[in-house]
Amino acid sequence: MLTVPEMGLQGLYISSSPERSPVPSPPGSPRTQESCGIAPLTPSQSPKPEARALQQASFSVVVAIDFGTTSSGYAFSFASDPEAIHMMRKWEGGDPGVAHQKTPTCLLLTPEGIFHSFGYTARDYYHDLDPEEARDWLYFEKFKMKIHSATDLTLKTQLEAVNGKKMLALEVFAHALRFFKEHALQELREQSECMLEKGAVRWVLTVPAIWKQPAKQFMREAAYLAGLVSREDAEKLLIALEPEAASVYCRKLRLHQLMDLSSRTAGRGRLGERRSIDSSFRHAREQLRRSRHSRTFLVEAGVGELWAEMQEGDRYMVADCGGGTVDLTVHQLEQPHGTLKELYKASGGPYGAVGVDLAFEQLLCRIFGEDFIAKFKRQRPAAWVDLTIAFEARKRTAGPHRAGALNISLPFSFIDFYRKQRGHNVETALRRSSVNLVKWSSQGMLRMSCEAMNELFQPTVSGIIQHIEMLLAKPEVQGVKLLFLVGGFAESAVLQHAVQEALGTRGLRVVVPHDVGLTILKGAVLFGQAPGVVRVRRSPLTYGVGVLNRFVPGHHPPEKLLVRDGRRWCTDVFERFVAAEQSVALGEEVRRSYCPARPGQRRVLINLYCCAAEDARFITDPGVRKCGALSLELEPEGCPENTGTSPSRREIRAAMQFGDTEIKVTAVDVSTNRSVRAAIDFLSN
């Protein structure tokens, strides 16, 4: 067993063999200066991961919140009747002719930063504000994507409202989650005969599968701030990955609840194809309208008909096409219990419906000038929101074979503001522009040809198809024959047609659930009832720590040599916990043991490193970065619980799990057999 040098340790120094030591690296190595000394107590061979039984928290009801980029909502089911999914009440407001049961992800705060409203209420109230007054209100929309794109996400990260004012992102998300919490609890109180006891609710939050650990932790922190759960009851909150939730839900569907694009288009010409898709969507809308009337959706107690046809080892892909991102995952069916195994780490990118909105904004910049659009958004924020709403309504009617042009209303304030800024009217601007597919109609509207509208879809749709094709080319996912298109953007006939045209000829069966926009929400409820359904996941990154190894000439680089007390060490060695793309079972643990470096030490901080490569040797290698810190809180010396063992020799056994939707850690003080408060912080960088 190794001893601890006098000098305190920095970073994480784990020893899995007698050839390793916790001696610190020399000055200049990329580590923090926090004193987090530990002595390794692991055996000579690195312990193999162990699986333990999952501890299920008791609950009476599951409430899932699908927090989307463009729209959000909640649903719930009782533990006594898990197959009955109760949808939220129909929201007040809404867009005429738009079949959508969720509410826009729009938050409105007063000029003082106090919560005013959310969803349709927020959007409509902001729309009705006087233009000058609206400049002082804080209106946030489509802000979920900011968390995904932030490279240095912390608890201090800020979001910018439409008027340019900034606010802590954590508070913005907490306002939104608190809104859903209060609505859901009120509805539960009205439906349940007995009052819900504290802790009776298991909450589920959906996030994209491609989100990294800091973004997932951020959502959990926002949930704590919103009061969904306390840190002491952290297990009452689950993070569900959106394509996984969709996959869980699709397992329950019957054939009449699915639209098979492959069979709809087989053997038909273009006209027959269009009629088939349009007809199927009318049927889907009617089915959805009827289900909304009752707001209770019953799923199969077992698996649906499509799943009943599948056999052990069958593979399928889920493409979650949402407002902000496309999320791809590939699952393999395991029998006899119908559990799922992830075959390749989640992939995707920023190819959501928002990309079409950005293309429309770029089109306006080409016509009216980038400087004017920027100024209009800044000085007339409410009118800009009106314009985006008008475009959204027309975007939903776009189709690959639509014959007629689409009219988009320009707010009067846009027309007036442009005339005052440029000295001529918008019709003149359109005539002078190089955009030939957009005209000015006699009704005072932008008249877009179908070609122009479809061009706005092209970059986003192409990005989605390219990602699917890249994933299908991976050796690990060979044999996939079924593709589920889910998410709000999957309602688009443009996207459906493009995916079927590109992939249908490869023998891939493309299937769309009728309630495609609610698939993730309903699946999140089912996931909350049985989170163990996804039994094996793939680690998206390689995780580990920095250690010192006995220096071996010819094997270790000379620049990594460190001599201390006459012993030669190799510094900055990357000790791997789990490798990128490694299969990790749910409940599987990676265990390490440590002891404090100093008597009386109350806290141990251990730096975690990650990279995309599987074969990184040193924490200084390109692509390896510090991504978080493991914190262990120790009992003070002299506590009755302490058996008298010297703190410097006290063993702390930590167990980390990489097979869940979040990386989790637990720790035990071996001398007392008491739990040690342990946490991993990914937001401190």
Swiss-Prot record:
It comes from Mus musculus. One of its GO terms (molecular function) is ATP binding. Keywords: ATP-binding, Nucleotide-binding, Phosphoprotein. The modification Phosphothreonine is found at T42. This is Heat shock 70 kDa protein 12B. Signal peptide: none annotated. Coiled coil: none annotated. The modification Phosphoserine is found at S25, S29, S44, S46, S276. Expressed most strongly in heart with little or no expression in other tissues. In the aorta, preferentially expressed in lesions. Residues 1-50 are annotated as: Disordered.
